Curated annotation (Swiss-Prot):
Its main location: cytoplasm. InterPro entries: FAD/NAD-bd_sf (IPR036188), GIDA_C_N (IPR049312), MnmG (IPR004416), MnmG-rel (IPR002218), MnmG-rel_CS (IPR020595), MnmG_C (IPR026904), MnmG_C_subdom (IPR047001), MnmG_C_subdom_sf (IPR044920). SMART domains: GIDA_assoc_3. Homodimer. Heterotetramer of two MnmE and two MnmG subunits. Keywords: Cytoplasm, FAD, Flavoprotein, NAD, tRNA processing. NAD(+) binds at residues 271-285. This is tRNA uridine 5-carboxymethylaminomethyl modification enzyme MnmG. NCBIfam families: mnmG_gidA (TIGR00136). NAD-binding protein involved in the addition of a carboxymethylaminomethyl (cmnm) group at the wobble position (U34) of certain tRNAs, forming tRNA-cmnm(5)s(2)U34. The gene is mnmG.
Amino acid sequence: MTTEYDVIVIGGGHAGCEAAAAAARCGARTLLLTHRRDTIGAMSCNPAIGGIGKGHLVREIDALDGLMARAADRAGIHFKLLNRSKGPAVHGPRAQADRSLYRRAIQDLLAETANLDIAEGAAGDLIVDDAGQAAGVVCEDGRQFRAGAVVLTAGTFLRGVIHIGHDSHPAGRVGEPPAHALGERLQALGLPMGRLKTGTPARLDRTSIDWDSLAEDRGDAVPEPFSRLTQAIDNPQLSCRITATTPRTHALIREHLHLSAVYGGAIAGRGPRYCPSIEDKVVRFAERDSHQIFLEPEALPGNAGGDLVYPNGISTSLPADIQEQLIHSIPGLERCRIVRPGYAVEYDYVDPRALAPTLELTALPRLFLAGQINGTTGYEEAGAQGLLAGLNAARRAGGGEGIAIDRGAAYLGVMIDDLATQGVSEPYRMFTSRAEYRLSLRADNADLRLTGQGIGWGCVGSARAHLFTAERDAIDTAMQRAGAESFLPDALQQAGITVSADGRRRTLLDVLATAATPDAIARIAPWFAALPSRVSRHVETEARYSGYLVRQAREIRQLEAETRITLPADLDYRRIGGLSSEMQERLAAARPASFSAAQRVPGITPSALMALLSHVRQVA
């Protein structure tokens, strides 16, 4: 087997798969090094892709010809567009996936990728050349592979430890050993490191659940694919069911809280704020006597894992016997059998402030990091980072300039900027609220924002490039025609569109920004009604958002200018609309005396600053 490559990617999780595929698409001879081939693309925690903010990242991965969206479409068994009742900027495409089908889809897509080799092995050391740059990897069995750039996507494996109650053992995932030697090596290199934790709930036996007693949660009647390349969703679609914890559940948790790995002192690393364990929920929200649980099928019946159910909402590290009591206190699960108990896993991460915006370590050139090693949580966050790291590793190995994606261009850019400039104190999860440009960073326009650039970067294949060019041209033509075609009030009123009889002509874009019905639009512009739905939806959304986009740009300019505003010493950040609980806590702890000082509080996002500025103006 070849031992010389342009790029080596360590780790076959979501970040590693995207990194390896991206580097190979760019023409780099790439090696994906993983513990086991059969676990490539495994969904370690929840069997779902996408969500609010996360779905945007999946669409951005797809726009740059990544794998995740296509794999989710091939494996999806329950599609739902979250926030459908709200504006398109915060729509969150999400899909439950059959774990076995998703893993197979990722492996098939990698097998179809030119310039890519896959090898089994555990990375134990990095090769660092005389210039202090990463030059390859040494496996624990002594094999060496050299490369012009290395991408490390270790997930939860760096000195990982699994905890169930007070029992713990080294592991990166259930049944898989941790990367202990590699963690030691990174620490010896002087990288700024810390510990974080995440967790997962018990897996339940599908046949032991009282399904008929539980409310049904159906997916969308017409599933909307993640990928622009997907023509149709072929899998049968399944429903989820909804239940909830009870006061008895909470009493059990409080009674045995000292046995939890987190609250019993066994774990030092912080867990994800926005995906808390059930112990965290009971402690942090003591006034509540119930928390919702979604019972999500892990696979289609008859497929591997088809007898398992994922109870979304009750991640835990309590002892296995207490978990059983907890499960039996929940409606519909009174006789449920636990197939595998939930657990917490603690692992090493590298402070992402040590990274350049390209995801290259500034202290160790040619080594790129992506995924949970950078302090993030979630498949989508990992996959997006992996794609950028693989793209930049290929360019670095080939002598090209690195690419940094601006936060005004993509949620990926928002995430990287947040990580590299602010660091993390807990696992970072993407939300639409983190983006100050979210009106223009929609899930439905990811390709229009990024695919053209991806073509120039060399990471987009010909099939996607041709589709993108045709759709972009159709949208541009429709936008121009809708902006040029105008109507007098009489014509609009005759079509059933309510406007002021002021004699002023209105363009079709003006009309689309109103509450005019599709039938009324069809009467005045039959050509528009005949457009492909993707084209007409985009034009309509742009028309409706045009005023907001102008205001957004103005607010951003004001944000940059108004740094001298003073803040009251007794300002109650909990009363400021638009601030997440995380932002409230950070500002309340820092108590900045001025708006300028607020901008320097670690972890404060631009969107939080705009909410603060708006509040101060209102009360002034």
